[in-house]
UniProtKB/Swiss-Prot annotation:
Example of a GO MF term: glycine hydroxymethyltransferase activity
Organism: Metallosphaera sedula (strain ATCC 51363 / DSM 5348 / JCM 9185 / NBRC 15509 / TH2)
Name this polypeptide is given: Serine hydroxymethyltransferase
Annotated positions of the N6-(pyridoxal phosphate)lysine modification: 227
Family affiliation: Belongs to the SHMT family.
Main subcellular location of this protein, as a coarse class: cytoplasm
Residues with site note (Plays an important role in substrate specificity): 226
Pfam families reported in the protein's UniProt record: SHMT
Pathway(s) served: Amino-acid biosynthesis; glycine biosynthesis; glycine from L-serine: step 1/1
Cofactor: pyridoxal 5'-phosphate
Binding site for (6S)-5,6,7,8-tetrahydrofolate: 121-123
GO biological process: glycine biosynthetic process from serine; tetrahydrofolate interconversion
């Protein structure tokens, strides 16, 4: 083996990824985002080589004095932007945050109610994901087709009849808020807990364009830190109930996480500070952009889901593309032109259509952070029409998409700081 040539392969693949996804593609994956240059710079630190099992100032390792301080700061900043009393940043994903909470609230064989799959329930809420792995029986609450949401009246009856250990709201195809305030009193009346999975909408929540579930009766708020909240990949658990929170916090280590990827912590802290300053403006622009994209797509003849409800109140837009070849074909075709979306089940799709659903899911949060606004959403919709409906030459369309993206390469809604005075050997993100 020529090690030097093999090394060059790895480096070139990394350079190619950075060039393609960071400078050439219009990224519309609803579960992704981009950190600020400052947050990225701090991500590349000695923290990534270290361990710190346990909680701050109560570790099972030595050498953690700076870890303890930065983790405490990060939790404090996150509580500030969330409006919560308690935070745990050790889950390394939103799914692990869910797992820790679910495991404490129920035992194998117990029942949990979840939002209906048609209303966007995440796979971790189902028998195919975390609940199934934990042996907890999940039961879907009734679906209201007209409102594309949980049917509150029938869900209340189900809660009173089944008396589950907990109820889960939130989801992954998530256009409209779930009825936290309407269900919380009934959940608590049967001695159950209400868990809200805000992985997708956490940044909208901290930006005050999405209601805070903790203010509406949720006992736990589980999130991802890298979707509409534009931080490093990771998870977090929030609560205002000290005793319940302590029970969950005690289980994260050693049940679900040993080392919790410490290099996330400075970047998470920086992102929280950025959202304290810019979060409301960012979230408002996200929702303006998603609405503008939905309306523009509809004007070009696309079958955008939820027209009678105003299409969306989140960062997402859902489009039925069955008549254009289906979700799998459309997602691949758009990718060939450098527009990145994902195929997605729509409310009317059967679960077995997961590999070739009728829909695509679009998220505008990353392109919003690169400075795109309503006018650019209309331009994206027209590009999609030219690719999928007019069937323009794919190479020509790729050039047009890349040219458009070249105008939006600077991350907005971000703090800056001159790190050069530290003479740090920071590894640049773009090689």
């Amino acid at each position: 083996m020529d090690v030097q040539k093999e090394l060059e392969k790895v480096i070139e693949l990394t350079r190619s990824q950075n060039r393609w996804r960071r400078t050439e593609t219009i990224n519309l994956i609803a579960s992704e985002n981009v950190m600020s240059p400052l947050a990225e710079a701090l991500y590349m630190s000695d923290f990534m080589s270290r361990y710190a099992e346990g909680k701050p100032f109560k570790r099972f390792y030595q050498g953690t004095k700076y870890v303890d301080e930065v983790e405490t700061l990060a939790m404090d900043y996150m509580n500030q932007v969330t409006g919560s009393k308690f935070c745990d940043l050790r889950p390394t994903s939103g799914t692990l945050a869910n797992a820790a909470v679910f495991r404490v609230l129920a035992n194998p064989g117990d029942k949990a109610l979840i939002a209906p799959v048609q209303a966007g329930a995440h796979v971790s809420h189902t028998k195919f994901g975390t609940l199934g792995a934990l042996g907890i029986e999940h039961i879907e609450m009734p679906y209201d087709e007209e409102n594309m949401n949980v049917d509150v009246d029938r869900a209340v009856k189900m809660i009173e009849q089944i008396k589950p250990k907990f109820v889960v709201l939130g989801g992954s195809l998530y256009l409209f808020p779930h009825p936290t305030k309407d269900l919380a009193p009934h959940v608590h009346s049967v001695g159950a807990k209400l868990v809200y999975d805000a992985a997708h909408v956490y940044g909208l929540m901290t930006g005050k364009v999405w209601s805070n579930p903790l203010d509406e009766g949720a006992d736990f708020l589980n999130v991802s830190t890298h979707k509409t909240f534009p931080g490093p990949q990771g998870g977090a658990i929030f609560s205002n109930e000290e005793e319940e929170f302590k029970k969950v916090s005690r289980t994260i280590f050693p049940w679900f996480v040993s080392n919790h990827h410490l290099h996330r912590l400075p970047s998470t802290a920086v992102t929280a500070l950025e959202m304290k300053v810019y979060g409301e403006d960012y979230a408002k622009q996200i929702t303006r952009n998603s609405k503008a994209l939905a309306e523009a797509l509809a004007s070009f003849g696309f079958k955008v889901i939820g027209e009678h409800l105003g299409y969306t109140k989140s960062h997402q837009v859902a489009v039925d593309v069955k008549n254009l070849g289906g979700g799998a074909y459309v997602a691949k075709t758009l990718e060939s032109a450098n527009i990145i979306v994902n195929k997605n089940l729509l409310p009317h799709d059967p679960p077995e259509a997961v590999n070739d659903p009728s829909g695509i899911r679009i998220g505008v949060q990353e392109m919003t952070r690169f400075g795109m606004k309503e006018g650019e959403m209309e331009e994206i919709a027209e590009l999609m029409k030219q690719i999928l409906v007019d069937k323009r030459d794919i190479n020509e369309m790729r050039r047009k998409v890349t040219e458009m993206r070249s105008r939006f390469l600077e991350v907005k809604y971000a703090l800056t700081y001159d790190l050069s005075k530290y003479n740090s050997k920071l590894i640049p993100m773009i090689l």
